[in-house]
Amino acid sequence: MTHSEPHPATLPPLDEPTRCLVRLAAVIGAGTERQVRAFLLEARALPPDWVEEVILQSYLFAGFPRTLNAAREWRRLSGAAAPGADPDADATVMAEEWRARGQVTCAHVYGDMYEHLRVNIAKLHPALDHWMITDGYGKVLSRGGLDLVRRELCVVAICALAAQDRQLHSHFHGALNVGATPAMVSGTLDALSDLIDDDSLRRYRLLWGHVRTAHTKLAQGKV
């Protein structure tokens, strides 16, 4: 299975490795350096590719400084050297493929809202539309090493801890669209309960409830 395709929802509500991963994603994006260090220590029990990919994708949501800090700490704590090369990151040969697979992955994530999204982002700036597809969904979120369901759950986690409500709403939908079960999304919020203040967590659970209800009605043909 390529990672531009939905991943079958065969996970339990939130298995312990995935719980560890979403917590790591959240603190890389919006936690303290001490939290990042502590959660990376725990992450040594995870498949290394998962950790590498969560660190790499964090630059889309948290910027290069936090990504570089996490990567540096991961190299130190894991003792694992960086790969000697990464052909999938070479723009001179991959640019066209990034755009093609980015369109596919973004369409999976946004479903029926995909065309509307493209129009709205282009109205903000055409460069943002190009970068969203080519860099965000093509170059980064379509990489191998981590399935799209876990990637989306990690995006939910980072948006929640960073208090990015609008993006959180979008990626609640996105997680369901790519195959996450409602229990997985609920489990992701539960995994952050010691990191997010009670008022915010209550608000996010309410928002998630609205999204879940909307998806249920859509599946039943009631809307």
What is each of the regions a protein language model found here?
Residues A160-Q164, D194-L195:
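Short Gly/Pro-enriched loop/turn and capping motifs at secondary-structure junctions
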Residues E52-L56, S186-D190:
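Beta-strand segments within the central parallel beta-sheet cores of soluble alpha/beta enzyme folds
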Residues A157-A162, A175:
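Short, glycine/charged-rich beta-strand-loop motifs at protein surfaces that mediate ligand recognition
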Residues L21-V27, R151-C159, T188-L192:
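Short, structured motif recognition centered on aromatic/hydrophobic residues
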Residues G31, A163-R166:
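Alpha-helix capping and inter-helical loop/turn segments
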Residues F39, D165-H173, S186:
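Short conserved catalytic/interaction loops centered on acidic-Pro-aromatic/His motifs
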Residues V178-A183:
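Accessory, usually C-terminal, subdomains that scaffold auxiliary metal cofactors
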Residues M1-R19, G29-W50, Y59-L148, N177, ...:
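Acidic, glycine/proline-rich low-complexity segments that act as flexible tails and inter-domain linkers
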